[in-house]
Amino acid sequence: MFPNSILGRPPFTPNHQQHNNFFALSPSLYSHQQLIDAQFSFHNADLSRAVSLQQLTYGNVSPIQTSTSPLFRGRKRLSDEKNLPLDGKRQRFHSPHQEPTIVNHIVPLSDERRYSMSPLFHTHYVPDIVRCVPPFREISILEPREITLPEAKDKLSQQILELFEACQQQVSDLKKKELCRTELQREIQLLFPQSRLFLVGSSLNGFGTRSSDGDLCLVVKEEPCFFQVNQKTEARHILTLVHKHFCTRLSGYIERPQLIRAKVPIVKFRDKVSCVEFDLNVNNIVGIRNTFLLRTYAYLENRVRPLVLVIKKWASHHDINDASRGTLSSYSLVLMVLHYLQTLPEPILPSIQKIYPESFSPSIQLHLVHQAPCNVPPYLSKNESNLGDLLLGFLKYYATEFDWNSQMISVREAKAIPRPDGIEWRNKYICVEEPFDGTNTARAVHEKQKFDMIKDQFLKSWHRLKNRKDLNSILPLRAAILKR
């Protein structure tokens, strides 16, 4: 896949092990962790891996036994492999086939990679600070309990479930993204040897679809210095180097790399092998934290994921789900759904930040963030509303009940709270509080025309759905399923 694709290199010798607090992992906590030794075959059209598990030992590290077979054979994908159907076997929540272990890990580098090319840091490579970022495991660890889909006795609820089962992200989709992340991390470490790359957003937060892009966060500085990366200067400079690297060294594997100079600059690109579109940012640490906050909400109650998916599809169909065009981001939409479920007379969701503040503190080090969902048990709500009623209620709430002029949506507080007086909230038509840093996730909606269009769509869709009780009245079901 990429030029330096050789997974499973042995760790450094004990005298070169890192001692930095950010990466220092307790042997007692991680003695049973395992790494993936993945062998990828382009002969397999669904990009499946043969996975063997190896024991990861901390303290006096003995070398990890690694596969002798190369990860990639250097052969590009055959043309007839590119157009294979996306369909894989659909899985319900209670499927006995759990998702595989997904590892966001940093790999020790060989001697030829020892010096950073970045003029920003001028940092020589020091082996004793590099080791492993703990694994970001998928459902088997993050969601160990069995979750079944809610019952659907009415037509509208059945349609929502049908859409969800057809469009939810599959294991194979996640494998493709994780494989690309692993290889990109190795390549980016040619530029920044101390960096590590995290898969974030809908790919891991439980709200992904078959067509979801991959979001990547490049962490180049260690705690507690994360927020010292200036997004207007340093982040752009870092991404300029990454973009140049993609355009030159990886031009055969990545296509259409584009540097977007937004408030949080990103590099957009497409992986030729997986055909997945990616957005890569630098040190947007809050994105890593909110990924696991949202994942906790996603699996806290079995109606959450289907409801979020149908609302995202509805918003996209009506052109109100694109922050780059002045409407709502998917993240804002998810927070709006969670807020609605928190504010029902009989809430379906609580504020888990209030109930478990120690698990979702902004000060928790990154290598511990992925443990948060494991600490939260299922939430048993007395609310028995079906999915159809909840979708109707969501549309009605934002069409007729929520006060856009004076209120802010707060998932952290589990209620609507008064708008702040800060400059970021002035002249903004929609205010959605980011649960960790308190910023406005809906700041892109800054034109009255776009705001009116959003409100109008809530109102029209509510009336149509209330009268017909058919999802097709607001979202063509067949077309939505085909888009995935």
UniProtKB/Swiss-Prot annotation:
Domain of life: Eukaryota
Function comment: Cytoplasmic poly(A) RNA polymerase that adds successive AMP monomers to the 3'-end of specific RNAs, forming a poly(A) tail. In contrast to the canonical nuclear poly(A) RNA polymerase, it only adds poly(A) to selected cytoplasmic mRNAs. Does not play a role in replication-dependent histone mRNA degradation. Adds a single nucleotide to the 3' end of specific miRNAs, monoadenylation stabilizes and prolongs the activity of some but not all miRNAs.
Gene Ontology molecular function, alphabetical: ATP binding; metal ion binding; poly(A) RNA polymerase activity
Family: Belongs to the DNA polymerase type-B-like family. GLD2 subfamily.
Main location: cytoplasm
Positions bound to Mg(2+): 213, 215
Keyword annotations of the record: ATP-binding, Cytoplasm, Magnesium, Manganese, Metal-binding, mRNA processing, Nucleotide-binding, Nucleus, Phosphoprotein, Transferase
Cofactor(s) required, per the database record: Mg(2+); Mn(2+)
GO terms (BP aspect): hematopoietic progenitor cell differentiation; histone mRNA catabolic process; mRNA 3'-end processing; negative regulation of miRNA catabolic process; RNA 3'-end processing; target-directed miRNA degradation
Location(s), subcellular: Cytoplasm; Nucleus
EC number of this enzyme: 2.7.7.19
Domain PAP-associated: 386-440
Protein name in UniProt: Poly(A) RNA polymerase GLD2
Motif Nuclear localization signal: where in chain: 76-92
